[in-house]
């Protein structure tokens, strides 16, 4: 039995007979599936829809990527159903998202992490991302590292950390603008990104103002940043140390260092 469910012009089922399509008319066929990850041996679940008019049979292939993941969603008001927005520097914003809990401050390679809205790291906390981890962002989503918080991306040569959109079809593999940015806010400190791929967003990394620390706001090593609709890296009056990095194919500028700062590449 198939895990796919069909709905043909409002009628659910798996076997449909005598469906009339008038001249110059059409029908809607909706397909959905819910797959138990433990019941499949391959990450690709496949099936076919067969169309038969009695004289000719044709098939349409159905292919679904089945992958377990950790999902991070913003909260929602139980009465109005309005999605929660972040409060930054004590002021409400229109940025949909929430702060990560202490239990969520380590991303591993056991399961991908899928982020809806902005996942924020609160002051005096550190988000650690381990080798081989994959972070998928939904549309207009991203990461925010708040004042006095830190980001540690600890990829390796053979196990890079990947940041990209959550549309994994081949047609989206090089499409810019699928998600927002990794925003290192003013006052975030000692951020380190090593052996990462950051691709297909609006701004790969947005880095804000210099802190009183003698260490760079961001140390960026062995990292590829490409296919962003606006900037690969946008640095505003900040401090960056970069070694062995590739930044390219951005809509406005691959690297923009503005309003002064200290930059060593």
Where are these regions (language model features)?
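Beta-strand/loop edge motif enriched in small/polar residues
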Residues: 14-61, 65-265
């Amino acid at each position: 039995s198939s895990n796919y469910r069909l709905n043909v012009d409002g009628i659910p089922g798996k076997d449909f007979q005598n469906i009339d399509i008038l001249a110059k008319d059409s029908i809607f066929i909706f397909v959905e599936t819910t797959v138990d990850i433990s019941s499949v041996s391959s990450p690709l679940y496949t099936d076919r829809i067969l169309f038969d008019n009695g004289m000719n049979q044709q098939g349409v292939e159905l292919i679904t990527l089945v992958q377990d993941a950790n999902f991070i969603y913003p909260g929602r008001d139980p009465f109005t159903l309005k999605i929660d927005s972040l409060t930054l520097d004590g002021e409400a914003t229109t940025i949909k998202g929430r702060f990560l809990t202490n239990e969520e401050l380590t991303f591993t390679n056991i399961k991908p992490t899928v982020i809806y809205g902005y996942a924020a790291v609160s002051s005096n906390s550190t988000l650690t991302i381990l080798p081989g981890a994959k972070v998928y962002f939904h549309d207009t989503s991203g990461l925010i590292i708040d004042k006095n918080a830190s980001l540690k991306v600890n990829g390796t040569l053979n196990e890079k950390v990947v940041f990209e959109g959550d549309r994994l079809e081949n047609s989206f593999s090089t499409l810019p603008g699928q998600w927002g940015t990794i925003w290192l806010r003013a006052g975030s400190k000692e951020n380190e990104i090593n052996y990462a791929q950051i691709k297909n967003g609006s701004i790969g990394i947005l880095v804000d103002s210099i802190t009183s620390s003698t260490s760079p706001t961001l140390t960026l090593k062995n990292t590829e940043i490409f296919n962003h609709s606006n900037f690969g890296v946008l640095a505003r009056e900040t401090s960056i140390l970069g070694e062995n990095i590739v930044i390219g194919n951005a809509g406005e500028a691959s690297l923009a260092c503005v309003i002064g700062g200290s930059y060593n590449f």
